[in-house]
């Protein structure tokens, strides 16, 4: 299942990086084709893949810069699955079986005992080939996700008082008129 959707995303990251756009996050949804020994035609499976490199967000006055890493990418996947109603039975299992991936920074994603996909950092040799810095990718089988049993969605009322991420007060002496 590895890299059926991701090679195009890595090409796009490389294109952006060559033009000095260092902080990029992309995703792609589409069909992946598997050779089926029993049939002439390949089997089509709907997948979603993503690739992130650089900073997740720049430094601001109240937060330091946050580079993309394994745990951030894993969190994006967990959030996506949760938004789709899959909150139980997800586990991430470390693996070294994907040769294009960094052996110590890759995990297969399971729903109960069913393989959904993988997440991890691309192998340094592959990153060098694409002229990329640390890059994290994931690929998920959408058909298995759609077919998975979903938890009950719970409505949560929106607060009447919106949050304010920034509150600025200026103290100006009375002598200043303009």
Please annotate each region the language model reported.
Residues 1-178:
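Extended beta-strand-rich architecture
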């Amino acid at each position: 299942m590895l890299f059926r959707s991701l090679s195009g995303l890595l090409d796009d990251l490389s294109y952006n990086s060559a033009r000095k756009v260092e902080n990029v996050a992309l995703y792609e949804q589409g069909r992946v084709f598997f050779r089926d020994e029993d049939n002439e035609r390949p089997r089509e499976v709907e997948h979603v893949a993503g690739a992130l490199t650089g900073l997740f967000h720049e430094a601001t006055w109240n937060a330091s810069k946050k580079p993309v890493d394994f745990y951030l990418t894993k969190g994006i996947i967990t959030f996506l699955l949760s938004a789709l109603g899959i909150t139980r039975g997800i586990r991430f299992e470390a693996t070294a079986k994907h040769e294009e991936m960094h052996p110590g920074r890759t995990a297969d994603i399971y729903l109960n005992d069913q393989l959904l996909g993988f997440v991890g950092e691309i192998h340094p040799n592959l990153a060098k080939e694409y002229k990329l810095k640390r890059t994290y990718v994931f690929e998920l089988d959408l058909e298995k996700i759609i077919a998975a049993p979903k938890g009950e969605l719970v409505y949560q009322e929106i607060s009447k008082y919106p949050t304010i991420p920034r509150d600025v007060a200026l103290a100006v002496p009375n002598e200043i008129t303009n």
